[in-house]
Amino acid sequence: QGRHPPIPPAP
């Protein structure tokens, strides 16, 4: 939780 792009769910 901070200033970073959302991480997409891994397949």
Curated annotation (Swiss-Prot):
Keyword Secreted, does the record have it?
yes
Q: Which family does it belong to?
A: Belongs to the bradykinin-potentiating peptide family.
Q: Name one GO biological process term.
A: regulation of blood pressure
Q: Which organism is it from?
A: Bothrops jararaca (Jararaca)
Annotated GO MF terms: peptidase inhibitor activity; toxin activity
Tell me the protein's name: Bradykinin-potentiating peptide 11h
- Modified-residue entries (Pyrrolidone carboxylic acid), positions: 1
What keywords would UniProt list here? Answer: Hypotensive agent, Metalloenzyme inhibitor, Metalloprotease inhibitor, Protease inhibitor, Pyrrolidone carboxylic acid, Secreted, Toxin
Give tissue specificity per the record: Expressed by the venom gland.
Q: What does this protein do?
A: This peptide evokes slight hypotension (-2 mmHg), when injected alone into rats. It has no bradykinin-potentiating effect, when 60 nmol of BPP-11h are coinjected with 0.5 ug of bradykinin into rats. It inhibits angiotensin converting enzyme (ACE) activity with a K(i)app of 87.07 uM.
Q: What is the lineage of its organism?
A: Eukaryota, Metazoa, Chordata, Craniata, Vertebrata
Chief place of localization? secreted
Q: Name one GO cellular component term.
A: extracellular region
Q: Which domain of life is it from?
A: Eukaryota
